[in-house]
Amino acid sequence: MACRYGLKTSLMLLAWASTAFSGLPARAVQSTCAETKTTVEMSLCIAKVLEQKDRELSVAMQQVATDASSAVGGQFPRIWKSSLNDLYKTSADPEEQLAAFQQARRNACVYLNSLSIQGTGFGIFVSNCEIRMTDALMQSLGR
C-alpha cells in the first residue's frame, strides 16, 4: 500500500524538523564525514549516514508498533490505527510507516532545497535535510 503525503503534510514535517533541531545533527554529519576530500566522497559518506539512520528508525518504529499493540485497555491501539489509516492513509505496519515517512521527508527536503535556491550540492543538501528530519523523529520517539 503506497502512501503519498501532500505538500501540506510534507511542509508540516519540514517545519517540525527545523524547529526540533537547531543544526546539531548537521554538525554531527559534518564531523562524521569531515575526512572526505571530494563532493563524491561527501555524498557517499552522507548516504551511508542516512542509511544507518533509516535502519535505526526502522527498529524504533517497530518498537512503537509493539508498544502500541500491547497497550493496556486496547483503546490506544484503535485510536492509533484509525489515525494512521484515516488521516495519514497508511497502516500500523512499521515498514509502511517508514516508507511513508521517507517519501514525505524526501519531498519536504527537495522542496526546501528549491526554496533556499541551492543550485549546487543538491544531493548533499537534501540528504543532510533528511538526516535532520530523521533525527527529529527519533528524538520524538525517545530514541
Question: Where in the sequence are the language-model features?
Answer:
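Bacterial N-terminal signal peptides that target proteins for export
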Residues: 1-13
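N-terminal alpha-helical modules
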Residues: 24-143
